[in-house]
């Protein structure tokens, strides 16, 4: 790779320049023996980065933060947050760095961020490092979410550092290169608010408006418009999580983005057997972030954002509170509409028309199918794929999944009367998701040096709606001996 190719890597520093109070210049830890494990070539091209360069020795060092382009200044970002309901006034990037910003092929500004790049001033007791398994988990799941059409941060690369990292055992270290619309979080606003620097809070909000919701700038109250936009984005996002059976696992306020992108995939999972109380994270002992609790927790987080933004919504705090409460009230309406409309589409009964999804008959069918799923602990993803076969006249696969055939048959008769669109169902209900047992299989193999299962899984989940020969095992639930699934964040 030529020097000319390297010179095309230009990173901006807008966040650090406009919000220097939230940015601490810092250097990544040197990796002793780096090795590129996986590179997202299409994403690299979208960002104007040469995949060949990124695969070179210098390019790999760039992905680790060990080779910083001229003019770039990596920074650790400061933020606060509520973690499992407990407030921490200072969290920040303890093991991560914002390398800078890139403009993508559509003219959007995107953050290039490293995870596992070493201790920063925010590290507290942590070692600042990450290990191969959790970084590849984020790569797999974030790219699967993108393929599902769900707003998410993206994964550009995972690089093994060549350093062993102590967790319960000694494990191979790694760095994830992550791409996002920004890394602004609810916790960013909480940190700015706790400084009692209203001018900083205003600059942060202006930065968020400029990057994510420029239409808010023209509103009578731009900051209220920003808040309403974040509420709407999160209502849509969480509904999309619920519709595919995604459990985030750690919905702290520092893990909720202003952009409406899913971020931080540490202890995430997808439900197999439908269970509203599903919890996979080892640290969520009380079930705070269980599958069915996710909309409630998102609303709770947004209330914390409103508290942080009160000085911007109205200079008179007493006047600001009812305005913020009214704006937050939009979340339940918007989430309910997105969930009901999405479920109707999963049933092949609506092509996105709100009036169709809102029909009482359709809503009754939505309620009925969730009852069938729950009562029989039915595989959530496979059920809807097989239901599309029933829409085409073959009900044997789906009937073979349910416990109460009489209840299903009564429900299905009413559903069939509405002439469900099987093609719409196939375009809406994925055949392939990152099933927990397949993710663990890929991570275990990769930790041992075998990347083939990882690449096969990525092949499946990168085109989730199109069934292909040879990928049948990727549509199936976990084997009986897989046992109870528990995830760990890897810190």
Curated annotation (Swiss-Prot):
EC annotation from Swiss-Prot or TrEMBL: 2.7.7.-, 2.7.7.108
GO molecular function, one term: magnesium ion binding
Species of provenance: Pseudarthrobacter chlorophenolicus (strain ATCC 700700 / DSM 12829 / CIP 107037 / JCM 12360 / KCTC 9906 / NCIMB 13794 / A6)
Cofactor(s) needed: Mg(2+); Mn(2+)
UniProt family annotation: Belongs to the SELO family.
Known catalytic reactions: L-seryl-[protein] + ATP = 3-O-(5'-adenylyl)-L-seryl-[protein] + diphosphate; L-threonyl-[protein] + ATP = 3-O-(5'-adenylyl)-L-threonyl-[protein] + diphosphate; L-tyrosyl-[protein] + ATP = O-(5'-adenylyl)-L-tyrosyl-[protein] + diphosphate; L-histidyl-[protein] + UTP = N(tele)-(5'-uridylyl)-L-histidyl-[protein] + diphosphate
Statement: the UniProt record of this protein carries the keyword Manganese: yes
Residues binding Mg(2+), per UniProt: 255, 264
Active site, renumbered: 254
Alphabetical keyword list: ATP-binding, Magnesium, Manganese, Metal-binding, Nucleotide-binding, Nucleotidyltransferase, Transferase
Name of the protein this chain belongs to: Protein nucleotidyltransferase YdiU
NCBIfam families linked: PRK00029.1
Known function: Nucleotidyltransferase involved in the post-translational modification of proteins. It can catalyze the addition of adenosine monophosphate (AMP) or uridine monophosphate (UMP) to a protein, resulting in modifications known as AMPylation and UMPylation.
Annotated positions binding ATP: 92, 94-95, 115, 127-128, 178, 185, 264
Coiled-coil annotated spans: none
Top-level taxon of the source organism: Bacteria
The UniProt record lists the keyword Metal-binding: yes
Entry-linked InterPro entries: SelO (IPR003846)
């Amino acid at each position: 790779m030529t020097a000319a190719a390297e010179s095309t890597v230009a990173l901006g520093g807008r966040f650090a320049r406009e919000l220097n109070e939230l940015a601490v210049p810092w250097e990544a830890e040197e990796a002793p023996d780096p090795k590129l494990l996986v590179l997202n070539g299409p994403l690299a091209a979208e960002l104007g980065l040469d995949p060949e360069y990124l695969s070179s020795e210098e390019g790999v060092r760039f992905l680790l933060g060990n080779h910083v382009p001229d003019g770039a200044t990596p920074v650790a970002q400061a933020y606060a947050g509520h973690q499992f309901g407990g407030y921490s006034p200072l969290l920040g990037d303890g093991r991560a760095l914002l390398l800078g910003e890139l403009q993508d092929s559509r003219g959007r500004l995107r953050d290039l961020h490293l995870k596992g790049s070493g201790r920063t001033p925010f590290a507290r007791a942590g070692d600042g490092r990450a290990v191969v398994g959790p970084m590849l988990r984020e790569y797999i799941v974030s790219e699967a979410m993108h393929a599902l059409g769900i707003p998410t941060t993206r994964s550009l690369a995972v690089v093994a550092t060549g350093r062993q990292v102590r967790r319960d055992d000694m494990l191979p270290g790694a760095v994830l290169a992550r791409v996002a619309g920004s890394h602004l979080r609810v916790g960013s606003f909480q940190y700015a608010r706790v400084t009692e620097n209203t001018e900083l809070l205003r600059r942060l909000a202006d930065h968020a408006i400029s990057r994510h919701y420029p239409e808010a700038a023209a509103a009578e109250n731009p900051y209220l418009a920003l808040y309403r936009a974040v509420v709407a984005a999160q209502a849509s996002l969480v509904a999309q999580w619920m519709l595919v059976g995604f459990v985030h696992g750690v919905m702290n306020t520092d893990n909720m983005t202003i952009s409406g992108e899913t971020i931080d995939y540490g202890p995430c999972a997808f439900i197999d057997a439908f269970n509203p109380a599903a919890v996979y994270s080892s640290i969520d002992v009380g079930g705070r972030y269980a599958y069915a609790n996710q909309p409630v927790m998102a609303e709770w987080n947004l209330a914390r954002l409103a508290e942080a933004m009160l000085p911007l919504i109205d200079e008179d705090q007493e006047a600001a509170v009812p305005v913020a409460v009214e704006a937050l009230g939009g979340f339940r309406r918007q989430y309910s509409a997105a969930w009901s409309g999405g479920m109707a589409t999963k049933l092949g009964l609506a092509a996105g028309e709100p009036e169709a999804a809102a029909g009482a008959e359709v809503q009754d069918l939505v309620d009925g199918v969730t009852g069938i799923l729950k009562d029989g602990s039915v595989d959530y993803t496979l059920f809807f794929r097989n239901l599309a076969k029933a829409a085409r006249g073959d009900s044997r696969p789906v009937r073979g999944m349910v416990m109460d055939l009489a209840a299903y048959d009564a429900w299905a008769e009413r559903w069939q009367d509405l002439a469900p669109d099987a093609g719409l169902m196939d375009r809406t209900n994925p055949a392939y998701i990152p099933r927990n047992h397949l993710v663990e299989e890929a991570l275990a193999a990769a930790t041992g040096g075998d990347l083939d299962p990882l690449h096969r899984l990525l092949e499946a989940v990168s085109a989730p709606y199109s069934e292909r020969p040879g990928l049948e095992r990727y549509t199936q639930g976990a084997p009986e001996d897989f046992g109870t699934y528990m995830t760990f964040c890897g810190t």
